[in-house]
Amino acid sequence: MNIIDEINQEQMQSVLPAFGAGDTVAVHVKVKEGDRERVQIFEGICIARRNRGLHSAFTVRKISNGEGVERVFPSYSPLVTKVEVKRRGDVRRAKLYYLRDLSGKAARIKEKLG
């Protein structure tokens, strides 16, 4: 194992729950406003996972005031304090980019049973 891999392993300490595309997740993020720091919750559907070791990330999409909002979170960022899985989605794709073109009830995802 070379030195870069060792440093990456040290940085990858955060433990995320098992979730994938289609799952509804609530991401707790530290937000700094001036001298104050608070935790903000971003809840939506995970539409993509990117597994690249230390550079892993996941994309969460939600509808806010009728407008679609997507945010990419690095998996091992110290600003991501917690990820909660609200419900499991039953999907057949790894990337759900087609949800960007759908609106309303068409953009719903079936819940995985069992």
Swiss-Prot record:
<dbReference type="InterPro" id="IPR018257">
    <property type="entry name" value="Ribosomal_bL19_CS"/>
</dbReference>
<dbReference type="GO" id="GO:0003735">
    <property type="term" value="F:structural constituent of ribosome"/>
</dbReference>
<comment type="similarity">
    <text>Belongs to the bacterial ribosomal protein bL19 family.</text>
</comment>
<protein>
    <recommendedName>
        <fullName>Large ribosomal subunit protein bL19</fullName>
    </recommendedName>
</protein>
<dbReference type="GO" id="GO:0022625">
    <property type="term" value="C:cytosolic large ribosomal subunit"/>
</dbReference>
<dbReference type="Pfam" id="PF01245">
    <property type="entry name" value="Ribosomal_L19"/>
</dbReference>
<keyword id="KW-0687">Ribonucleoprotein</keyword>
<keyword id="KW-0689">Ribosomal protein</keyword>
<dbReference type="InterPro" id="IPR001857">
    <property type="entry name" value="Ribosomal_bL19"/>
</dbReference>
<dbReference type="InterPro" id="IPR038657">
    <property type="entry name" value="Ribosomal_bL19_sf"/>
</dbReference>
<dbReference type="GO" id="GO:0006412">
    <property type="term" value="P:translation"/>
</dbReference>
<comment type="function">
    <text>This protein is located at the 30S-50S ribosomal subunit interface and may play a role in the structure and function of the aminoacyl-tRNA binding site.</text>
</comment>
<dbReference type="InterPro" id="IPR008991">
    <property type="entry name" value="Translation_prot_SH3-like_sf"/>
</dbReference>
